[in-house]
């Protein structure tokens, strides 16, 4: 008599140790799971709600300055080291891991207008209202030694900004003109100017390192070529630009922080139209800095908040504010793309998470898998009204909220006036101007 026996391979269901999870057989045939989409929708909704519950972006406040923080700089090789310059001429070096100040330098008389590090991280440069450029060692002096600069350059005018070349021993300063300096010389190797107004900021391109951009008080953004020692082109906007920042991953893209509450992302090959206009701030934008990934940037504003924008979106994905934080003067995104630092005029430097609900520290494999799964679910259902409303909701201070309502009314009034003008004019006599082109006055080559 032949008997047929059911047999299973123990490797398919027996755990190796009692700490392992029980293996559960699953059949992924869609016909057997008719309610898969409703289940995923509920999971996406719960994941979105939990993201808002765990959104605690504020990490630390670094206090010690006796005046407003005017500028920040990152160490090119050490993630934990940050430099800050204040309005009383004091420069401090901070350790972000220990969250304390490790060195204090009285660098200038008056404001520290700019600070930048050398590309190798051995020294840093500062400029101030006392018409000097000073180079300092990154490592402090020995016990009993006085704090002295390595090198001091006495200028003829006030310098308002400084930036170092990404690969060579060359740096640029700005004031009445843009000067290019060799570190070993006390006179500029070349000077470039276009116009007569003072220049507030200068930045080297991190990819095409011979290119640099500057913004002036006469509403210009000027691009220079260091090899030819001449200006290339300039774009004139409606209002003054405070600073610019180059995209670290795309050589031709830069973002300008403007006085008209907007940020403009330009492609330097076609300056007549911005790639994107970023609108959400309700006061002048004072500083901007890119994430190392080049996908997002953070902006600091006079409206006492900082916002994180995706490069390809006109609206911010995140806004950070606190009760005590006043006008935010400077902002930096750390080199590991995880944290944001901002300096404000109530003398504090604040440290934030780049992703408000991110869990810090080492994640287990199951935590990583759950995080990735929830992220995919949120992307899949992001346009559903209920999920979209929860994901976009932010608590704002009353001052910012009321200004947003006021700006919305003004914008609607302008739109209505434009529509009426077109309606009651001869067809074709009133041109339609897109939002992107409205703010560009001219491009000069």
UniProtKB/Swiss-Prot annotation:
It comes from the Eukaryota. CDD domains: WD40 (cd00200). Its main location: nucleus. SMART domains: WD40. It is found in: Nucleus, Nucleolus. Expressed in the endometrium during decidualization. Expression is down-regulated in preeclampsia decidual tissues. Pathway: Protein modification; protein ubiquitination. Residues 353-441 are annotated as: Required for nucleolar location. GO terms for cellular component: cell junction; centrosome; Cul4-RING E3 ubiquitin ligase complex; cytosol; nucleolus; nucleoplasm; small-subunit processome. Part of the small subunit (SSU) processome, first precursor of the small eukaryotic ribosomal subunit. During the assembly of the SSU processome in the nucleolus, many ribosome biogenesis factors, an RNA chaperone and ribosomal proteins associate with the nascent pre-rRNA and work in concert to generate RNA folding, modifications, rearrangements and cleavage as well as targeted degradation of pre-ribosomal RNA by the RNA exosome. Participates in the 18S rRNA processing in growing oocytes, being essential for oocyte nonsurrounded nucleolus (NSN) to surrounded nucleolus (SN) transition. This is DDB1- and CUL4-associated factor 13. The gene is DCAF13.
